[in-house]
Regions:
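Bimodal "functional hotspot" detector
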Residues: 1-11, 15-165
Length: 165
C-alpha cells in the first residue's frame, strides 16, 4: 500500500513539474478560447522562427487569426492588434491598439492569460507587460497592471473562466 501511495505521489509531482518547463524543442502551446468563451484551450503550434522577437511576432500573429474553429477561437476580438515593443532582460512588452479598451472583462482576462501563458514558454521571456496605444495598461482602480507571469493566472480546466490573481 505504501508503495502504491509513493508511486501516485511521484506521478503527481512529475505531472506538476511539466508546466514549468520551456517548450522550445517540441513546439509551443498557443492558447485560445473555448467555443463558450469561458476558458482557455491549448493548441499545439510548430513555429518557423527559433527565438527572440521573431518568435514572439510569429506566435502573436498565430494567436490573432489562425485559431478559429467550432471548438475554439482566437482570444483576439476583431480589430485588436498587437505589436512587440521591446524584449529585454526577460521582459516582453506588447503594445495593443485602442480596440483593447473595447473588450468586456471576461474577454480581457482571457486575452491576458492566453498571451502571457503563450509567450512565457519562450526561453527569452520571463514576464510580459501590456501597453495600450503606448500607455501602461491600467486596472479598474487606475493602477498600472505591471509585469505578468504564467503564474499570475489560475489555470482551471473545464467551463470556468481562467482568473487573474
Amino acid at each position: 500500500m505504501a508503495g502504491f501511495a509513493a508511486a501516485v505521489f511521484l506521478g503527481l509531482m512529475l505531472t506538476g513539474c511539466q508546466g514549468t518547463q520551456k517548450a522550445e524543442q517540441s513546439g509551443y502551446k498557443v492558447f485560445c478560447r473555448n467555443a463558450e468563451a469561458t476558458a482557455l484551450r491549448e493548441v499545439q503550434y510548430e513555429p518557423e522562427a527559433e527565438g527572440g522577437e521573431k518568435l514572439v511576432e510569429e506566435l502573436l500573429s498565430a494567436m490573432e487569426g489562425t485559431f478559429n474553429r467550432n471548438d475554439y477561437q482566437s482570444v483576439f476580438p476583431e480589430g485588436l492588434t498587437a505589436a512587440v515593443s521591446t524584449l529585454k532582460d526577460g521582459r516582453l512588452t506588447i503594445d495593443f491598439n485602442d480596440a483593447y479598451k473595447q473588450m468586456d472583462d471576461t474577454r480581457e482576462v482571457l486575452l491576458r492569460a492566453a498571451v502571457v501563458q503563450t509567450m512565457t514558454q519562450i526561453t527569452d521571456v520571463r514576464e510580459v507587460v501590456f501597453t495600450v496605444a503606448g500607455e501602461a495598461l491600467l486596472n479598474s482602480e487606475n493602477q498600472a497592471v505591471g509585469p505578468m507571469h504564467a503564474s499570475s493566472f489560475i489555470n482551471s480546466e473545464g467551463d470556468s473562466i481562467n482568473a487573474y490573481q
